[in-house]
């Protein structure tokens, strides 16, 4: 048996009418002499003696629908070339087998499945179901075109009013701040603040004066009761040294650097 064929006609009967072979040849665009005919296909056990993808078109004239099983549909798909056509002619019955045959073809991977009246004058084969094998082969691949999504365009309204930030500033805001001169007092040996003091020395001297201490009391502290140098816990209520750290009589009192700072 030939391993390839332009067209193949199979039937489960003993013979196949010539006009059925002619219909297949005309539909597939071949001459009748190019069609290979196989009768009693049920005896083949669902196998066809052809190579894979070696037949251009297949005509199956099936009298008994049970002979057109899933295995036989798969075998037809195997021997058909990509894009090949299959025509199935079956006898009408009360159970309407057309829908079941169409369903088998769809499940077998065929496309464009259509049912129509047969052109043959044989009343026993009056229904023809036409289908087509997909145009791509098993295992073939092709690139997919990915849709490129561009960034959304921002619509800028040129008519919108923009506020100039500089217009929100006043003349006073634009002036540079004048920093006070540090240590502008012309102090001498006594280190006293000048009349127009702006460095903060005058305020510091005012805080010292509030303690009611003279410079002699700070430089040479003395205690009449003997408890002034021991600290506030031992000083009387009128002690001029209240609030100062403990000291030794005759020793100069050293005030801490933050002593005159205001308590927060």
From Swiss-Prot:
CC cofactor: [2Fe-2S] cluster; [4Fe-4S] cluster
In which domain of life is the source organism classified? Eukaryota
Indicate where this protein resides in the cell.
Cytoplasm; Mitochondrion intermembrane space
Q: Does the keyword Iron-sulfur apply?
A: yes
Annotated region described as Fe-S binding site A, given as residue ranges: 185-199
Name the residues that bind [4Fe-4S] cluster.
225, 228, 236, 239
- GO MF assignments: 2 iron, 2 sulfur cluster binding; 4 iron, 4 sulfur cluster binding; electron transfer activity; metal ion binding
Motif Cx2C motif 1: list the residue ranges.
Answer: 225-228
Motif range (Cx2C motif 2): 236-239
The cellular component terms of Gene Ontology attached to this UniProt record, alphabetical and capped at eight, are: cytoplasm; mitochondrial intermembrane space
Linker: region residues: 143-174
Segments of this protein annotated with the region N-terminal SAM-like domain: 1-142
Record note on domains: The C-terminal domain binds 2 Fe-S clusters but is otherwise mostly in an intrinsically disordered conformation.
Q: Which family does it belong to?
A: Belongs to the anamorsin family.
| Oligomeric form and interacting partners | Monomer.
Write the protein's name: Anamorsin homolog 2
Q: Which organism is it from?
A: Oryza sativa subsp. japonica (Rice)
